[in-house]
Swiss-Prot record:
Matching NCBIfam families: arc_protsome_A, PRK03996.1
Presence of keyword Zinc: no
Quaternary data: The 20S proteasome core is composed of 14 alpha and 14 beta subunits that assemble into four stacked heptameric rings, resulting in a barrel-shaped structure. The two inner rings, each composed of seven catalytic beta subunits, are sandwiched by two outer rings, each composed of seven alpha subunits. The catalytic chamber with the active sites is on the inside of the barrel. Has a gated structure, the ends of the cylinder being occluded by the N-termini of the alpha-subunits. Is capped at one or both ends by the proteasome regulatory ATPase, PAN.
HAMAP family: Proteasome_A_A
InterPro entries: Ntn_hydrolases_N (IPR029055), Proteasome_alpha (IPR050115), Proteasome_alpha-type (IPR023332), Proteasome_asu_arc (IPR019982), Proteasome_asu_N (IPR000426), Proteasome_sua/b (IPR001353)
Record keyword Cytoplasm present: yes
Domain of life: Archaea
Protein name in the entry: Proteasome subunit alpha
GN (gene name): psmA
Chain segments annotated as coiled-coil in the UniProt record: none
Origin organism lineage: Archaea, Methanobacteriati, Methanobacteriota, Stenosarchaea group, Methanomicrobia
One Pfam family cited in the UniProt record for this chain: Proteasome
Gene3D superfamilies per record: Glutamine Phosphoribosylpyrophosphate, subunit 1, domain 1
Length: 241
Protein backbone atom coordinates (compact mmCIF):
# COMPACT_ATOMS: atom_id res chain seq x y z
CA UNK A 1 0.00 0.00 0.00
CA UNK A 2 1.26 3.46 -0.88
CA UNK A 3 2.05 5.98 1.88
CA UNK A 4 -0.73 8.53 2.42
CA UNK A 5 1.46 11.43 1.28
CA UNK A 6 2.31 9.68 -2.00
CA UNK A 7 -1.14 8.52 -3.12
CA UNK A 8 -2.24 10.17 -6.35
CA UNK A 9 0.98 12.05 -7.04
CA UNK A 10 2.68 9.18 -8.86
CA UNK A 11 -0.17 8.62 -11.31
CA UNK A 12 0.45 11.68 -13.48
CA UNK A 13 3.83 12.76 -14.77
CA UNK A 14 2.86 16.44 -14.65
CA UNK A 15 1.87 16.57 -10.96
CA UNK A 16 4.39 17.49 -8.29
CA UNK A 17 4.06 16.00 -4.82
CA UNK A 18 3.83 18.45 -1.87
CA UNK A 19 7.56 18.01 -1.27
CA UNK A 20 8.43 18.88 -4.89
CA UNK A 21 8.98 15.42 -6.33
CA UNK A 22 7.94 13.84 -9.63
CA UNK A 23 7.46 10.21 -8.69
CA UNK A 24 7.30 8.90 -12.26
CA UNK A 25 10.75 10.35 -12.92
CA UNK A 26 12.04 8.71 -9.76
CA UNK A 27 10.54 5.39 -10.83
CA UNK A 28 12.29 5.76 -14.21
CA UNK A 29 15.56 6.24 -12.35
CA UNK A 30 14.85 3.02 -10.48
CA UNK A 31 14.61 1.23 -13.84
CA UNK A 32 18.13 2.47 -14.60
CA UNK A 33 19.41 1.39 -11.17
CA UNK A 34 18.13 -2.13 -11.85
CA UNK A 35 19.73 -2.24 -15.30
CA UNK A 36 23.05 -3.82 -16.24
CA UNK A 37 26.23 -1.98 -15.35
CA UNK A 38 27.86 0.30 -17.93
CA UNK A 39 31.03 2.32 -17.40
CA UNK A 40 32.83 5.08 -19.26
CA UNK A 41 36.42 6.21 -18.77
CA UNK A 42 38.21 9.19 -20.31
CA UNK A 43 41.98 8.74 -20.51
CA UNK A 44 45.02 10.44 -22.00
CA UNK A 45 44.53 9.20 -25.55
CA UNK A 46 40.86 8.27 -25.80
CA UNK A 47 37.64 7.11 -24.18
CA UNK A 48 36.49 3.61 -23.30
CA UNK A 49 32.92 2.31 -22.84
CA UNK A 50 32.34 -1.09 -21.23
CA UNK A 51 29.12 -2.91 -20.38
CA UNK A 52 28.06 -6.09 -18.64
CA UNK A 53 25.46 -7.75 -20.88
CA UNK A 54 24.13 -10.07 -18.14
CA UNK A 55 23.44 -13.30 -20.02
CA UNK A 56 20.82 -14.98 -17.80
CA UNK A 57 20.29 -18.16 -19.80
CA UNK A 58 22.65 -20.60 -21.48
CA UNK A 59 20.11 -20.78 -24.32
CA UNK A 60 20.53 -17.08 -25.08
CA UNK A 61 22.88 -15.99 -27.86
CA UNK A 62 25.20 -13.39 -26.21
CA UNK A 63 25.75 -11.64 -29.55
CA UNK A 64 22.04 -10.77 -29.69
CA UNK A 65 22.39 -8.50 -26.64
CA UNK A 66 23.60 -5.06 -27.66
CA UNK A 67 24.30 -2.37 -25.08
CA UNK A 68 26.92 -0.30 -26.93
CA UNK A 69 25.90 1.54 -30.10
CA UNK A 70 27.75 3.57 -32.73
CA UNK A 71 26.00 6.89 -33.40
CA UNK A 72 28.42 8.47 -35.88
CA UNK A 73 32.04 7.93 -36.83
CA UNK A 74 33.18 9.87 -33.76
CA UNK A 75 30.46 9.06 -31.19
CA UNK A 76 29.31 5.94 -29.37
CA UNK A 77 26.93 5.33 -26.47
CA UNK A 78 26.44 2.71 -23.76
CA UNK A 79 23.06 2.16 -22.12
CA UNK A 80 21.52 0.88 -18.92
CA UNK A 81 17.84 0.39 -18.12
CA UNK A 82 15.10 -0.47 -20.59
CA UNK A 83 16.80 -1.59 -23.80
CA UNK A 84 13.82 -0.64 -25.99
CA UNK A 85 13.91 2.92 -24.66
CA UNK A 86 17.67 3.05 -25.26
CA UNK A 87 17.24 1.93 -28.88
CA UNK A 88 14.65 4.65 -29.42
CA UNK A 89 17.09 7.30 -28.17
CA UNK A 90 19.93 5.79 -30.22
CA UNK A 91 17.81 6.02 -33.37
CA UNK A 92 17.00 9.64 -32.56
CA UNK A 93 20.68 10.41 -31.95
CA UNK A 94 21.63 8.90 -35.31
CA UNK A 95 19.02 11.00 -37.09
CA UNK A 96 20.21 14.18 -35.32
CA UNK A 97 23.77 13.37 -36.35
CA UNK A 98 22.79 12.78 -39.97
CA UNK A 99 20.70 15.97 -40.12
CA UNK A 100 23.65 17.99 -38.82
CA UNK A 101 25.97 16.43 -41.41
CA UNK A 102 23.54 17.15 -44.27
CA UNK A 103 22.73 20.69 -43.07
CA UNK A 104 26.22 21.90 -42.14
CA UNK A 105 28.54 19.42 -43.88
CA UNK A 106 30.28 18.60 -40.60
CA UNK A 107 30.14 16.11 -37.75
CA UNK A 108 27.85 17.02 -34.88
CA UNK A 109 29.53 18.19 -31.67
CA UNK A 110 29.37 15.60 -28.88
CA UNK A 111 28.03 18.09 -26.34
CA UNK A 112 25.42 19.44 -28.76
CA UNK A 113 24.12 15.93 -29.49
CA UNK A 114 24.01 15.13 -25.78
CA UNK A 115 22.01 18.29 -25.07
CA UNK A 116 19.57 17.54 -27.89
CA UNK A 117 18.91 14.07 -26.47
CA UNK A 118 18.46 15.43 -22.95
CA UNK A 119 16.09 18.14 -24.18
CA UNK A 120 14.03 15.38 -25.80
CA UNK A 121 14.08 13.27 -22.63
CA UNK A 122 13.04 16.26 -20.54
CA UNK A 123 9.88 16.82 -22.59
CA UNK A 124 8.70 13.37 -21.47
CA UNK A 125 8.68 14.62 -17.87
CA UNK A 126 6.54 17.66 -18.66
CA UNK A 127 3.55 16.56 -20.74
CA UNK A 128 0.69 14.16 -20.06
CA UNK A 129 -0.01 11.04 -22.08
CA UNK A 130 3.59 9.82 -22.01
CA UNK A 131 6.08 8.38 -19.56
CA UNK A 132 9.75 9.21 -18.93
CA UNK A 133 12.45 7.19 -20.65
CA UNK A 134 13.51 4.34 -18.38
CA UNK A 135 17.11 4.44 -19.53
CA UNK A 136 20.36 6.34 -19.04
CA UNK A 137 23.14 6.74 -21.59
CA UNK A 138 26.88 7.26 -21.47
CA UNK A 139 27.79 9.31 -24.55
CA UNK A 140 31.45 9.23 -25.58
CA UNK A 141 33.13 10.95 -28.49
CA UNK A 142 35.71 13.38 -29.82
CA UNK A 143 35.07 16.97 -30.93
CA UNK A 144 37.75 19.48 -31.98
CA UNK A 145 40.45 17.11 -30.76
CA UNK A 146 38.95 16.84 -27.27
CA UNK A 147 37.52 13.67 -25.76
CA UNK A 148 34.14 14.14 -24.08
CA UNK A 149 32.13 11.81 -21.84
CA UNK A 150 28.54 12.65 -20.85
CA UNK A 151 25.93 10.90 -18.73
CA UNK A 152 22.19 11.39 -19.28
CA UNK A 153 19.37 10.83 -16.82
CA UNK A 154 15.62 10.08 -17.28
CA UNK A 155 14.88 13.61 -16.05
CA UNK A 156 16.91 15.13 -18.88
CA UNK A 157 19.85 16.05 -16.67
CA UNK A 158 23.23 16.10 -18.44
CA UNK A 159 26.56 15.78 -16.63
CA UNK A 160 30.12 15.47 -17.95
CA UNK A 161 32.51 13.03 -16.28
CA UNK A 162 36.10 11.86 -16.39
CA UNK A 163 34.95 8.39 -15.36
CA UNK A 164 31.51 7.15 -14.33
CA UNK A 165 29.15 4.22 -14.18
CA UNK A 166 25.41 3.62 -14.49
CA UNK A 167 23.19 0.70 -13.62
CA UNK A 168 22.96 -1.71 -10.73
CA UNK A 169 26.70 -1.73 -10.05
CA UNK A 170 27.25 2.04 -10.07
CA UNK A 171 28.33 2.29 -6.41
CA UNK A 172 30.95 -0.45 -6.75
CA UNK A 173 32.21 1.08 -10.00
CA UNK A 174 32.52 4.59 -8.58
CA UNK A 175 34.41 3.28 -5.55
CA UNK A 176 37.02 1.70 -7.85
CA UNK A 177 37.28 4.85 -9.97
CA UNK A 178 37.61 7.19 -6.99
CA UNK A 179 40.51 5.10 -5.69
CA UNK A 180 42.34 4.26 -8.91
CA UNK A 181 41.36 6.61 -11.75
CA UNK A 182 44.31 8.27 -13.50
CA UNK A 183 43.58 10.83 -16.26
CA UNK A 184 47.02 10.17 -17.77
CA UNK A 185 46.35 6.46 -18.27
CA UNK A 186 46.56 4.88 -21.71
CA UNK A 187 43.64 3.25 -23.54
CA UNK A 188 44.95 -0.16 -22.51
CA UNK A 189 45.13 0.80 -18.83
CA UNK A 190 41.68 2.41 -18.99
CA UNK A 191 40.19 -0.80 -20.40
CA UNK A 192 41.79 -2.84 -17.61
CA UNK A 193 40.50 -0.37 -14.99
CA UNK A 194 37.02 -0.54 -16.50
CA UNK A 195 37.09 -4.34 -16.42
CA UNK A 196 38.27 -4.23 -12.81
CA UNK A 197 35.31 -1.99 -11.99
CA UNK A 198 32.92 -4.36 -13.81
CA UNK A 199 34.51 -7.28 -11.95
CA UNK A 200 33.71 -5.54 -8.65
CA UNK A 201 30.19 -4.63 -9.77
CA UNK A 202 29.34 -8.17 -10.89
CA UNK A 203 31.25 -9.89 -8.08
CA UNK A 204 33.43 -11.57 -10.67
CA UNK A 205 30.53 -13.00 -12.64
CA UNK A 206 31.58 -11.99 -16.14
CA UNK A 207 33.48 -13.47 -19.06
CA UNK A 208 34.22 -12.72 -22.70
CA UNK A 209 30.61 -13.49 -23.66
CA UNK A 210 29.10 -10.98 -21.24
CA UNK A 211 31.43 -8.02 -21.76
CA UNK A 212 31.17 -5.47 -24.56
CA UNK A 213 33.81 -2.78 -25.15
CA UNK A 214 33.81 0.31 -27.37
CA UNK A 215 36.68 2.78 -27.84
CA UNK A 216 37.57 6.02 -29.55
CA UNK A 217 41.23 7.07 -29.53
CA UNK A 218 43.83 9.30 -31.15
CA UNK A 219 45.21 6.62 -33.46
CA UNK A 220 41.94 6.34 -35.36
CA UNK A 221 39.64 9.14 -34.14
CA UNK A 222 36.58 7.04 -34.85
CA UNK A 223 34.38 5.02 -32.51
CA UNK A 224 34.54 1.25 -32.86
CA UNK A 225 33.45 -1.82 -30.93
CA UNK A 226 36.18 -4.30 -30.06
CA UNK A 227 36.13 -7.79 -31.52
CA UNK A 228 35.52 -10.85 -29.36
CA UNK A 229 39.20 -11.77 -29.64
CA UNK A 230 40.31 -8.33 -28.42
CA UNK A 231 37.88 -8.46 -25.50
CA UNK A 232 39.06 -11.97 -24.59
CA UNK A 233 42.69 -10.84 -24.31
CA UNK A 234 41.77 -8.15 -21.77
CA UNK A 235 39.35 -10.34 -19.80
CA UNK A 236 42.10 -12.96 -19.46
CA UNK A 237 44.39 -10.41 -17.83
CA UNK A 238 41.74 -9.55 -15.25
CA UNK A 239 40.99 -13.20 -14.51
CA UNK A 240 44.69 -13.92 -13.99
CA UNK A 241 45.29 -10.92 -11.72
Amino acid sequence: MQPQYQMGYDRAITVFSPDGRLYQVEYAREAVKRGTTAVGIKCNDGIVLLVDKRVNSKLLEPSSIEKIFKIDNHIGVASSGLVGDARSLVDRARVESQVNRVSYDEQIDVEMLSKKLCDHMQTYTQFGGARPYGTALLIAGISDGQFRLFETDPSGTLLEYKATGIGIGRNAVMKVFEEEYNPEASIRDAILLGLKALHAATEGKFDVNTVEIGVVNNDTPAFRKMSRQEVASFVEQIEQS
